[in-house]
């Protein structure tokens, strides 16, 4: 039964290549797809997930899509005994557990820090202090493109520039694009490499930066290969459509399915890199399997930018083809929001042979919409916006 700690040792597999794997956050969006792929490859998988009600609903029941061939433990990464009993016989640890929500992290500061930073610290402390009692050979942590702040930019000459965040005074006049701090000219967005200086602009982003730096640092110190994967904007089936702080594709889908306009800040031409969850899973598998990933950081994206307005229009065309809903471009802004950020994937392509396979327009969005149309999401966008607004964050 979920939540009980009468754990059996992870079973041995006949194939010597099969391993025992723990996935924290394995009932969530990315984690559950990763679990499916690991089970399919013959690995023995254990899931540790607290079934956060913001993601899984107030009854905190395991989702129907949870793989029946994986062992499920309902518990918190901050519970020392639960965490240790889940990880002590694992070979590989995928740390996906986290609270996710850039805006919400700016007022639920303690809880985001507790779960994301202290939860990771708890896991690493067990690795460090019980070294003789475990045989974990690799740890992989889910990081985020949010730690970059703004993406990379260049001048017309091609010279790279790392401008500061746009000042509120600029955006109050509807001047949305990034300006050269020296000349005032509009800068051109460029692919963002892993080497770009980090500029986290939210408590969530700060926590993600801390997670990856702690994992890499402790991994090096104890010679446990560690990998940090900086996810860009992930979309696909199993996104929490009723969570108003999740990805924009899910938020828009929830609005559209409830007959309401997706609300877009600024002018809608701000851009992100949207990657399908199946491609994110493949990146994780490559990082687990290849020594070239050890102690490295990788962007996990497509290398292509897409405007937020285009995403909204694509979802409307498929979820509300009659045209009863149109995007609502409000020309408002959220302080600290970035304008453009898309991935430079040359490193993960070169080192791990990764190539994104799912195109947003020709397959990815269709799968998301087919799944979303079968759901009955509760639209909580306005409730979340009020929470941000009363704190002056919108």
Tell me the role of every PLM-derived stretch.
Residues 32, 36, 40, 75, ...:
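C-terminal substrate-binding subdomain of Rossmann-fold SDR/epimerase-dehydratase oxidoreductases
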Residues 28-31, 78, 104, 122, ...:
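Short, flexible micro-motifs
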Residues 54-56, 148-151, 238, 307-308, ...:
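A short beta-to-alpha transition loop/helix N-cap that caps and shapes the active-site region
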Residues 196, 200, 237, 351-354:
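Aromatic-glycine-rich donor-binding/catalytic loop that engages nucleotide-sugar donors
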Residues 151-189, 203, 213-272, 277-286, ...:
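NAD(P)-dependent short-chain dehydrogenase/reductase
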Residues 6, 10-232:
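N-terminal Rossmann-like NAD(P)+-binding domain of SDR-like oxidoreductases, especially those catalyzing
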């Amino acid at each position: 039964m979920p939540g009980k700690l009468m754990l059996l040792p992870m079973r041995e597999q006949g194939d010597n290549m099969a391993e025992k794997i723990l996935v924290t956050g394995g009932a969530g969006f990315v984690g559950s797809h990763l679990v499916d792929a690991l089970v399919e490859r013959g690995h023995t998988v254990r899931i540790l997930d607290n079934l956060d009600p913001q993601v899984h609903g107030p009854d905190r029941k395991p989702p129907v899509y949870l793989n029946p061939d994986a062992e499920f433990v309902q518990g918190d990464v901050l519970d020392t005994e639960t965490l240790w009993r889940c990880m002590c016989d694992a070979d590989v640890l995928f740390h996906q557990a986290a609270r996710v929500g850039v805006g919400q992290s700016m007022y639920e500061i303690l809880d985001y820090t507790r779960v994301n930073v202290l939860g990771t610290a708890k896991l690493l402390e067990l690795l460090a202090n019980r070294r003789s009692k475990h045989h974990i050979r690799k740890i992989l942590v889910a990081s985020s493109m949010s730690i970059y702040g703004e993406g990379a930019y260049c001048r017309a000459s091609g010279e790279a520039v790392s401008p500061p965040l746009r000042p509120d005074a600029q955006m109050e006049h509807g001047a949305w694009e990034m300006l050269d701090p020296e000349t005032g000219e509009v800068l051109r967005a460029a692919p963002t490499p892993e080497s770009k200086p980090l500029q986290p602009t939210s408590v969530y982003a700060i926590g993600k930066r801390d997670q990856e730096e702690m994992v890499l640092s402790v991994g090096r110190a104890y010679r446990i290969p560690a990998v940090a994967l900086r996810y860009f904007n992930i979309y696909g089936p199993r996104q929490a459509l009723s969570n108003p702080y999740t990805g924009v594709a899910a938020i828009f889908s929830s609005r559209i399915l409830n007959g309401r306009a997706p609300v877009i800040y600024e002018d809608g031409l701000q851009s992100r890199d949207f990657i399908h969850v199946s491609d994110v899973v493949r990146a994780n598998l490559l990082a687990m399997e290849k020594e070239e990933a050890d102690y490295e950081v990788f962007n996990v994206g497509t290398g292509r930018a897409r405007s937020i307005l285009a995403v909204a229009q694509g979802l409307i065309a498929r979820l509300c083809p009659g045209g009863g809903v149109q995007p609502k471009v409000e020309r408002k802004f959220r302080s600290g929001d970035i304008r453009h950020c898309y991935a430079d994937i040359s490193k993960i392509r070169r080192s791990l042979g990764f190539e994104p396979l799912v195109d947003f327009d020709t397959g990815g969005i269709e799968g998301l919409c087919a799944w979303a149309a079968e759901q009955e999401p509760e639209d909580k966008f306005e409730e979340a916006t009020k929470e941000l607004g009363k704190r002056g964050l919108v």
